[in-house]
Structure formats: C-alpha cells, structure tokens
Amino acid sequence: MSLPWWRARFDLTLHEAKQDPNARIVWLGDSITEYWQRQGGHGYDDVLPVWQRDYAPYHALDFGFIGDTTSSLIWRLDHGEVAGLHPRLAIVLIGANNFGATHWGAAVTVPGIEAVVTDTQRHLPHAHILLLGVLPSIRSAWITAQTAATNAALARVYAHNPAVTFMNVGPVLERDGHADAALYVDPHLTPPEPALHPDAEGMARIAAAIAPVVRKYAGAP
C-alpha cells in the first residue's frame, strides 16, 4: 500500500467517489477492471469506448488497481474507498493476482473472495453484488487448475444467495475450452506476455454476458 503510484490511484478513487456519489454501478477489482479505461490507440486495446457505451450512462465508477489481490481490495474497502456511495450494483472481479507472485491457490483465494464479498456488503449494504469468476488466462497449468477450482467453489457458495449473483463469464473468452489468445491484449505487447487481460472485443463480450444482470439490478441506463 506504500507504492507512490498505488497511493495516488487510491486518492484518485476517493476523489471520484466524492465527485459522483450518485453512481449506480461500482466496479471493484484489479488491472482487468482498471483496463476499462484503456485507450491504447491500436483498436484491440481501445476498451474505453465499451465502458462509455455500457457503463458511463450509469455514472459507473471504475475502482480497479493493477496488481491487487483480494487482500488489497479489502484494504481499500476498509479505508473509505466506497464511503458515501449508494450504488444499486457492485461488480466484483478479483482473484487473478492471487495466483501470481503471491502463489495463493484456490484454498486461500476462495475464502479471500468470500471476504471481499462480505466486506462489500458491509460497506454497500443496499447494493446487489455481481461476482464474476476469475477469468481464464494462459499463464501456467497450475493457474488454470486453480482458476477452475476457485470458480467451481464460488458457484457452490453463492448458488442460493439472493444478495449475490455469481457468473462465470470465462467461456466467452475461450475457444475449444481454453482461453483464446486472440481475445487478449498481452500477446500484442513487445515483448509478448501471457494472455491475462481481455482486449476490447473480450471486454465487450463480458459486458454483453452480464448485461441482463446489470439491467435487472441497476435498471435502464
């Protein structure tokens, strides 16, 4: 929490929350969520137009942070990030970084995500929670296995919870049951990196997949 850029972004989110207290949707997550604001100029990485089309009409707030784990997100929630907000819908997408440098598997990540959901409910008691499963990536066989185990467990945990909708949107990013590298930004980088962050088409597919739930709980734009 002491990295200058991280602290600067946290301060920015606090400011944004005060500037737009009537936001009807709040996105909470890591770099994948932060990528909603990406406008790289190459087409495949121009994600911002999707956000402007699907979420800006809701005065949605994007609280995604590069590198954040479940623990980091809980810290943000507990230090005032959503204070004063009363959204109808909170969309949570977290967990990918648990499998990275920290090497936390499903056994740690599932309760971590459950803690994020509980904390979000505590700070945003009137918001419905749309919990997205950890997205597929092409990083390692171990991460792929942990992703599948995490999503299966979360589906069971929230199967009958009226306050939480769990959705595994991973299949919209897959081809033949595996992450489709053609739908990710990372392979386009120089040098190429393993597929982790969906590109503009991938994010548009996610937005389309969750649109019925967004309309159900956040209403019409």
Where would I find each of the regions flagged by the language model?
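Serine-esterase "nucleophile elbow" of acetyl-processing enzymes
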Residues: 1-66, 71-86
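Generic structural signal for well-ordered alpha-helices
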Residues: 113-118, 151-155
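A structural signal for short coil/turn segments at secondary-structure junctions
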Residues: 20, 55, 124, 161-162
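Surface-exposed acidic, glycine-flexible loop patches that form ligand/cofactor-binding
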Residues: 79-86, 120-123, 215-219
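Catalytic His-Asp segment of secreted/periplasmic serine-dependent ester chemistry enzymes
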Residues: 138-221
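Surface-exposed cleft-lining segments at the edges of enzyme active sites
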Residues: 62-65, 95-109, 137-143
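Glycine-rich anion/phosphate-binding loops
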Residues: 67-75, 104-113
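Structural recognition of the beta-strand scaffold that forms the well-ordered cores
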Residues: 24-29, 59-64, 88-94, 128-133, ...
